[in-house]
Structure formats: structure tokens, C-alpha cells
């Protein structure tokens, strides 16, 4: 949408450079809302840090054509090394979403922590609000040329009616648990929701599995077009 700069906005920015050390600061004030950003980088050591604080900022004043309103959040990051695939790089991230009003949705109590060490990224995400109560843990190895990671998602409450997916309120909120893993020669997934259970396991990596699945679909669609199913060919 169109970005508008409100007349009531006040912006102050500061940049300081001393040899390999770079520092920057920014403060934005608009009505009752404010945003503060501070960042520092040493290009010699590749050590960096940054923090962001947004309090009750009315985003609709900047994006009047979009249905996005109040935002409050805080974030902090620090680390060393600009090559995320290097085993010598490390980083930490903490993000907390205190309030986000988008359309009819009100999100709050959303927290994300992330770490990078030895090319391994780990993340922990929690959500505790009326729309979604959830915990997610994930990890992914950036150094490998093939997908290599795992994720677990535990949803204890998901309101599909409030999200506009279900026309009527549900008697009980949706809950489910998902655990998935991808390695060089293994892909597995386990899904449980109420009485429904689904398990997937393949003795191949993600890329070979995608190629095999694509080939299977191509052969199947060809047989459907020719109106002649060949089960032996499909099993190859």
C-alpha cells in the first residue's frame, strides 16, 4: 500500500563512524507511539549488536490503505561473523511481540528466540493469545547442501472461527502436534490431532523424495489421460 509520513511525526537519526566501528541510532515519535533503534558494527572483528523497541506505534497512520494498526514489540540481536555458514560465526536473537492489531485480529504474547552456532540455527517460538496457543522448536544446518533439520509444533488452541476459516464457533478449539525431520537419507513426519494420526517416513532426503513424487504424479496423470492405469509402472 501507499506509505504516508504523518505531519505529527518526529524523526532523529545519528551515525557515528570511528575507524572500523560504526554506530547508528534512530528515534521516531508519532502521536503516542515511538520507535527506537540502536545498532553497532565493528568491521574488523565482525562483532555486531542491534536492538529495536516499538511502543504503541499506530501503523495505520503510515499505511492508511492497509488494515494494520497498533504495534508494540522489542527485539535484540548480537553476534560475531557476517558469514552465517561459517562454523566460527555465532548470533543470538530475542524478539517479543506485545501487541499487533491487524484487521480484526489481535495478536499478543508472541516470543521468539534464535541462536546460530557452528552453522546450526535453532529457534524457539511461543504464542499465548486468544487466537493461538502454541510452542514451536526448530533447528536447521546451514552448512549442508541438502535440507537438514527438524521441527516440532505443539498447538494447544487454534481458533479457526476467529481466523475466518470456520463459519461457526467450534465446540472445542483445534489442537494438534506435528514432528517432522529431514536428513540426508531420511524424511519423516508425525501428526496427531484428536483421534487422527498420520505418519510419513521415507528412506531418502527431501530432494530425492520431491523428484520421485514429481515423477509419480507425471506418470499417474499420463495414465489418467490415456485412461489406462498401470500399477506396476506406478510402483517403480
Labelled PLM ranges:
Residues 1-236:
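Interface amphipathic segments
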Amino acid at each position: 500500500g501507499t506509505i504516508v509520513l504523518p505531519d505529527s511525526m518526529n524523526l532523529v537519526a545519528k551515525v557515528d563512524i570511528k575507524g572500523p566501528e560504526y554506530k547508528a541510532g534512530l528515534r521516531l515519535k508519532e502521536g503516542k507511539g515511538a520507535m527506537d533503534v540502536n545498532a553497532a558494527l565493528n568491521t574488523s572483528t565482525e562483532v555486531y549488536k542491534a536492538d529495536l523497541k516499538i511502543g504503541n506505534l499506530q501503523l495505520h497512520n503510515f499505511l492508511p490503505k492497509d488494515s494494520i494498526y497498533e504495534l508494540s514489540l522489542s527485539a535484540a540481536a548480537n553476534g560475531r561473523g557476517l558469514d552465517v555458514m561459517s562454523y566460527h560465526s555465532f548470533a543470538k536473537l530475542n524478539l517479543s511481540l506485545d501487541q499487533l492489531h491487524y484487521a480484526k485480529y489481535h495478536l499478543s504474547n508472541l516470543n521468539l528466540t534464535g541462536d546460530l552456532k557452528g552453522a546450526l540455527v535453532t529457534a524457539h517460538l511461543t504464542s499465548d493469545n486468544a487466537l493461538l496457543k502454541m510452542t514451536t522448536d526448530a533447528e536447521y544446518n546451514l552448512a549442508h547442501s541438502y535440507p537438514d533439520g527438524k521441527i516440532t509444533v505443539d498447538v494447544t488452541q487454534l481458533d479457526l472461527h476467529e481466523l475466518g476459516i470456520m463459519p461457526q464457533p467450534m465446540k472445542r478449539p483445534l489442537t494438534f502436534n506435528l514432528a517432522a525431520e529431514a536428513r540426508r537419507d531420511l524424511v519423516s513426519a508425525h501428526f496427531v490431532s484428536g483421534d487422527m494420526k498420520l505418519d510419513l517416513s521415507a528412506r531418502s532426503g527431501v530432494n530425492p523424495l520431491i523428484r520421485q513424487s514429481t515423477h509419480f504424479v507425471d506418470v499417474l496423470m499420463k495414465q489418467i489421460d490415456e485412461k489406462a492405469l498401470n500399477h506396476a509402472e506406478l510402483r517403480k
